[in-house]
Amino acid sequence: VIFYFREDLKEIIKNLNLFEKNNLGLNLLIATAPIAIAGFMSKDFIEMNLRSEDVIFWTTLIFGLVLIFSNNLSIDQKNLNQISLRDSLLIGSFQVFALIPGSSRSAVTMIAALLLGYTKYDAAKFSFLLAVPTLFLVFTSELVDLSQESTNISYFNLTYVASISFLSAISCIHILLKFIEKIGFVPFGIYRIFLAGFILIF
């Protein structure tokens, strides 16, 4: 994500203004805040209570249906130049649902952006950009946990996984953005419904 959007991220960092309400960098920080707070407060609860097949089935099914519903409701009027603090906070609040096993971070943030009136392309782009600070927090948290649990961390394995993820992301993001812009989110919603059925059967 960082590599693909490197030019966008350079501009975001360069133009970061904490006093300009439509500033994209500020709005990405605002959108990250809810999951940072919720993740810190609920991590142990989620680990102990929500990692079950039933939870994964229902979240997979529900967010698939909501993705189709929000795609059909989308009015495609706003772009990222019109992003507001209110919208960012709402999108970030939706992102908290990504903490529930079976949900998708990108799906819930795209759903929120669509319901707020953003174009399909900009909903997807904001979701991808939001992944940068969000996944940085997740990676940092996991790294801290690993360092506390064991001194035998395989940095080779971490590097290998990161490299595979990097190559996969580069090959997929461009295709996904073009696909979403032309087709929308319905195929992804249908995929989640079929996946929920697979989970239920097996």
Where do the model's predicted regions map?
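Multi-pass membrane proteins that catalyze or facilitate reactions on polyprenyl-/lipid-phosphate substrates
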Residues: V1-F202
